[in-house]
Amino acid sequence: ALNNYVALRYSSTHMSWLHCMWGVGASAGPYIMGLVLSGGAPWNTGYRYVGILQVILTAILLLSLPLWKNRQTGTDSEASRGHAPEDSGQTAPAKPLSIKQITAIPGAKEVMVTFFCYCALEQTAGLWAASYLMLHEGISSETAAFYASLFYIGITVGRGASGFLTMRFNDTRMIRLGLILILAGVLTILLPLGGNTSLAGLIIVGLGCAPVYPCVIHSTPERFGADRSQALIGVQMASAYVGTCLMPPVFGLMANHISISLFPFYLL
């Protein structure tokens, strides 16, 4: 729902920064817990601090509800400037679409597959990078874990930078740029030049992942229509979670029964 709200009412810049904040939060949580544990406090103290932050954020959201209601969609803004069709005021609210109706929309199946594959790549890279670096490249477990964390840092920093790049480039160009960087990063990992090269490849893959997710979501109302965007974004998220949950374990089976060296080929 939040993705659809932003896609309809804000620019691609805001969508990129919204998802950048996901990376900030995902990084801050373990950091807070690490500080708590290193200070000798019990683990539930860390959860208490995070819970306090959640309560504060919830209060801010509740207090800001009037601002959310007053924000116009792109269509509403055009109407207020006199650019809407004459019968736009009589347009009925969009009815909920069934899965069959959604998949019948031209391009819906393709975007579902896109989200499945993208999230499969992102989650597999994030979960298995450290194991690949340790078992295949011979890097120590501590260093491998640090290197793997740079993948998510690459996504977070990349989405922050993407917010500025979207001021100049449209969603389609940003998605293409991201895919090119992902391919370049995976090919870099494949180079037999040692752990530092694999590290560089992981960071490049992370930077490439940065614009894909937010820009595909933001382009949904434009590609499929504002009346269908909520339904399309819903199935996109479902496809994303299926890819996230299913494909990393599949690679785990391959790594266990064949070889962990298949990691970059699996990402391709």
Each language-model region and where it sits:
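Cytoplasmic helix-loop-helix junction between adjacent transmembrane helices
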Residues: 1-21
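Extracytoplasmic gate region of multi-pass secondary transporters
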Residues: 105-149, 153-157
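Juxtamembrane intracellular "pre-TM" segments in multi-pass secondary transporters
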Residues: 72-111
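Small-residue (Gly/Pro/Ala) motifs that create kinks and tight helix-helix packing interfaces
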Residues: 25-38, 130, 162, 246-255
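C-terminal transmembrane helical hairpin of 12-TM major facilitator-type secondary transporters
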Residues: 169-216
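A late C-terminal transmembrane helix in Major Facilitator Superfamily
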Residues: 226-260
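Symmetry-related core transmembrane helices of the 12-TM Major Facilitator Superfamily/SLC fold
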Residues: 45-66, 262-268
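Helix-to-loop junctions at the C-terminal end of transmembrane segments
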Residues: 158-171, 255-256
